């Protein structure tokens, strides 16, 4: 078993980061995620948003893994459960693979919280528990997988910044459109007053 952990600070408020986290896929930084299906989403009586999603991924595999399972590329599935608590301002996301569970399990947990000293920033804490089963080189493979997870975490943070930029651009476009909609009737009204 291998445990991987990481912490990252986003220079954006918690509300922005959690909105982006829910819209992270698809993104150009991690094209291996080829589909996201929402299986269930509801708000509980305490106001927490619960989501259960299925992520479809397609990976090119290292040669040692290809020889073990006999495939060069494979589609895998990951189930993801998240809970957003708007009152405590936390988002916890847990994911686990549901493909190849007889060979490997990857259990990941991400937590998003406002930065304790700066409410305009958000702290992301990530941890993954990796277990390769039934192979004599399991420790080596777990290390390889931890390196892959670390690389993907960096891509994930880049993807979050990409989504945040995209959301901010959409908000600015809507605001500009709204300003234009307001100006047109006001200009027409002003023209009537001038007559």
Curated annotation (Swiss-Prot):
GO terms for biological process: phospholipid transport. One of its GO terms (cellular component) is mitochondrial intermembrane space. It comes from the Eukaryota. The modification Phosphoserine is found at residues 46, 51. This is PRELI domain containing protein 3B. Belongs to the slowmo family. Residues 1-172 form the PRELI/MSF1 domain. InterPro entries: PRELI/MSF1_dom, Slowmo/Ups. Keywords: Phosphoprotein. The gene is Prelid3b. The lineage of its organism: Eukaryota, Metazoa, Chordata, Craniata, Vertebrata. PANTHER family: MSF1/PX19 RELATED. GO terms for molecular function: phosphatidic acid transfer activity. It holds the Pfam family PRELI.
């Amino acid at each position: 078993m291998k445990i991987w952990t990481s912490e990252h600070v986003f220079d954006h408020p918690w509300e922005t980061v959690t909105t982006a986290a829910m819209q992270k896929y698809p993104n150009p930084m991690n094209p291996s995620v080829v589909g996201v299906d929402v299986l269930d989403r509801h708000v509980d009586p305490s106001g927490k948003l619960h989501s259960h999603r299925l992520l479809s991924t397609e990976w090119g595999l290292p040669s040692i893994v290809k020889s073990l399972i006999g495939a060069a590329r494979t589609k895998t599935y990951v189930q993801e459960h998240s809970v957003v608590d708007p009152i405590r301002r936390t988002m916890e996301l847990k994911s686990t693979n549901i493909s190849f569970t007889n060979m490997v399990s990857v259990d990941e947990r991400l937590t998003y919280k406002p930065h304790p000293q700066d409410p305009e920033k958000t702290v992301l804490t990530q941890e993954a528990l990796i277990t390769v089963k039934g192979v004599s080189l399991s420790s080596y493979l777990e290390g390889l997988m931890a390196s892959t997870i670390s690389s993907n975490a960096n891509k994930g943070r880049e993807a979050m910044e990409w989504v945040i930029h995209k959301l901010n651009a959409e908000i600015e476009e809507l605001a500009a459109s709204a300003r234009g909609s307001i100006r047109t009737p006001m200009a027409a009204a002003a023209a009537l007053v001038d007559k």
